[in-house]
Amino acid sequence: MWLPLVLFLAVLLLAVVCKVYLGLFSGKSPNPFSEDVKRPPAPLVTDKEARKKVLKQAFSASRVPEKLDVVVIGSGFGGLAAAAILAKAGKRVLVLEQHTKAGGACHTFGENGLEFDTGIHYIGRMEEGSIGRFILDQITEGQLDWVPMSSPFDIMVLEGPNGRKEYPMYSGEKAYIQGLKEKFPQEEAIIDKYIKLVKVVSNGVAHAILLKFLPLPVIQLLDRCGLLTRFSPFLHASTQSLAEVLQQLGASSELQAVLSYIFPTYGVTPRHSAFSMHALLVNHYLKGAFYPRGGSSEIAFHTIPVIQRAGGAVLTRATVQSVLLDSAGKACGVSVKKGHELVNIYCPVVVSNAGLFNTYEHLLPGNARCLPGVKQQLGMVRPGLGMMSVFICLQGTKEDLHLPSTNYYVYHDTDMDQAMERYVSMPREKAAEHIPLLFIAFPSAKDPTWEDRFPGRSSMIMLIPSAYEWFEEWQAELKGKRGSDYETYKNSFVEASMSVAMKLFPQLEGKVESVTAGSPLTNQFYLAAPRGACYGADHDLGRLHPRVMASLRAQSPIPNLYLTGQDIFTCGLVGALQGALLCSSAILKRNLYSDLKDLGSRIQAQKKKN
């Protein structure tokens, strides 16, 4: 009975895919990846004025290029990458950034004479020959240099009543697995099954990309028939929680906690996160981790010139007030706040990298916010958890202070779900006493150029999950003028987290020069992150469901308005990059994945000839 139906649906799907492929990718736009543009990296530019000319070009009407093809809202990497790809296809693109610096979560800032990252702490799969490295090289012309971090790249620390346990995550699949087995010799078979499942699931991520291109009625039909999850391990794992999968594998509670340690990188605890998301991250780091030489601002610094050379620009201090719509309801430009005035900029295509909530709830005119397609997408997602950041300036080099390039995830309970639920539901005055986890890293130890730029000093960063509601009463206050109560409350988290850090790194006692903290309100101000949610829409099971993934695509319900960045795919640099590829493919009506594959094949063939 089922076989004829399955065969019919398979034939129908094949016909639809062919028709969609011919329709979606029928454009005559130039191929942005027609040739290999990678060249040897130029020397690191440290001159402040030279960097300022690229990263801090303030908005004025006179700096807006003429005859624009595209305006991009937001200069996070999802916006910059989309703009650069479109520029490589001959488009004149203007990127508008509300902050004083371009880069979004890739920007850096100065504090007490040192430099701090705001969002890029480590990236996986950046070795030569990897797909991610290849794509970034083609976007930045090979100017980003990636430095391998030491092994182990991560250490999970479990602070318990019986003392401290450490679980290192080593670089390389064999070493990674062996490290786990040394800690859990009785569960070797479970670890093998887990790694095998991680690889099978993550290798099917192309199915998530395909969902973004197929017509929604086809997706809905396949979903109702159960075929989406039946034939795709990735889509099936998108309906299973991480906790559910680990329990099915028979892992002990301690092993479950260790295998789940990396969940803060996507912000959702094991019972509520999709195993597909987790598998992507674990597989992403199986070969080790990397850090951009010169710091995370190098990412924007080497992407922006590609946009400029095509006649475009990246302008800061440019707060977009609204997306302009014509009489037919199509996007036709943006309105930018300049002082007390509004400057209207018109163009045929608008791309938003501001995220679903900012775009649909704040940038669209009131009548457009009520459109069924807009309301439907907003109803599918919710903002993720907020985050506090603590930035510490240290006296001494990494050698003096014995600082590792390793990241530390510090936990106090193996039941991560219960600990987090208890924490975020607490009265705010008690929360700092029960911080369930800390992320601790030393960016200065990851960057080989650091000592030349900041001799004799080091940097440390800590990340703390935080509920926006705890800080909500100060949201209307101006930055820097939120009063002593705000600073006192913020410092309660700083003191609690520093106490944990000093026990883990006692050699830092007496070496701390200064400590600065940013709350979810800080993320909201500098990154325009609603409710301080630095990962955008929550990466829970609802968000990762195949039906929702298919709905959150580059084409918005507003004609000529496209979306890019992490809300279109997943969080992180590579997730934002995928969002940019999906967005650019839709605008250019080209299969950029196919273009990249063809270029890669030609490069490999040329290497064999040589």
Curated annotation (Swiss-Prot):
One of its GO terms (cellular component) is nuclear membrane. Its EC number is 1.3.99.23. Its main location: endoplasmic reticulum. The keyword Manganese does not apply. Residues 1-18 form the signal peptide. Pfam families: NAD_binding_8. Its cofactor is NAD(+); NADP(+); FAD. Disulfide bonds: none annotated. It is found in: Endoplasmic reticulum membrane. GO terms for biological process: retinol metabolic process. It catalyses: all-trans-13,14-dihydroretinol + A = all-trans-retinol + AH2. Keywords: Endoplasmic reticulum, FAD, Flavoprotein, Lipid metabolism, Membrane, NAD, NADP, Oxidoreductase, Signal. It is a peripheral membrane protein. Belongs to the carotenoid/retinoid oxidoreductase family. CrtISO subfamily. Catalyzes the saturation of all-trans-retinol to all-trans-13,14-dihydroretinol. Does not exhibit any activity toward all-trans-retinoic acid, nor 9-cis, 11-cis or 13-cis-retinol isomers. May play a role in the metabolism of vitamin A. Independently of retinol conversion, may regulate liver metabolism upstream of MLXIPL/ChREBP. May play a role in adipocyte differentiation. This is All-trans-retinol 13,14-reductase. It comes from Macaca fascicularis.
